[in-house]
């Protein structure tokens, strides 16, 4: 299984949006309300927001491909010389539970071998939480962040130490 992570440019914004809409609407429907899904998609994945993130290097987006077929994407920001934030890690529903997430993580670990990896994951997102635990992440904190319009992100802040 040869997965490739290709750095995304502004040209891939429509693909990131398409993947996001499919993934979020399928995966989060049992975790948060449909209204919150739509609100968060509009806020986080507008063309303007993605252009700002990609063009300013706030986040580095990578699209995961298997045989030239997009499977999902990740977004990483470097917090310090020895810390990265995995801001986004999403796979299409039909691509889950085939070992692809683990392969993508292996690529991330190999690209950032001396960096602790940290991320936020919704506390009710049990499948993802369990996946991260299997990958060696530990809960560092429990966070409730107001996202706007009365919506909250009820997350675990988790970390995988590499050193």
Each language-model region and where it sits:
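Acetyl-CoA-dependent GNAT
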Residues: 7-13, 18-94, 102-111, 144-145, ...
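Short glycine-rich hinge loops at helix-strand junctions in the catalytic core
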Residues: 99, 136
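C-terminal "cap" of GNAT-fold acetyltransferases
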Residues: 118-129, 133-135, 142-163
């Amino acid at each position: 299984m040869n997965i490739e992570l290709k750095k995304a440019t502004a040209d891939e914004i429509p693909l990131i949006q398409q993947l996001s809409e499919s993934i979020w609407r399928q995966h989060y429907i049992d975790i948060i309300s449909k209204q919150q899904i739509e609100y968060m998609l509009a806020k986080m994945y507008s063309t303007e927001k993605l252009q700002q993130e990609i063009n300013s290097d706030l986040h580095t987006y990578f699209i995961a491909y298997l045989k030239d077929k997009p499977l999902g994407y990740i977004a990483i920001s470097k917090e310090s010389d020895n810390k990265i934030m995995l801001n986004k890690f999403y796979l299409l529903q039909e691509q889950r539970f085939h070992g692809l997430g683990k392969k993508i993580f292996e690529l991330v670990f190999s690209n950032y071998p001396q960096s602790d990896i940290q991320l936020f994951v919704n506390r009710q997102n049990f499948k993802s939480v369990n996946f991260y635990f299997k990958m060696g992440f530990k809960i560092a904190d429990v966070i409730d962040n107001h996202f706007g319009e009365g919506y909250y992100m009820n997350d675990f802040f988790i970390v995988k130490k590499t050193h």
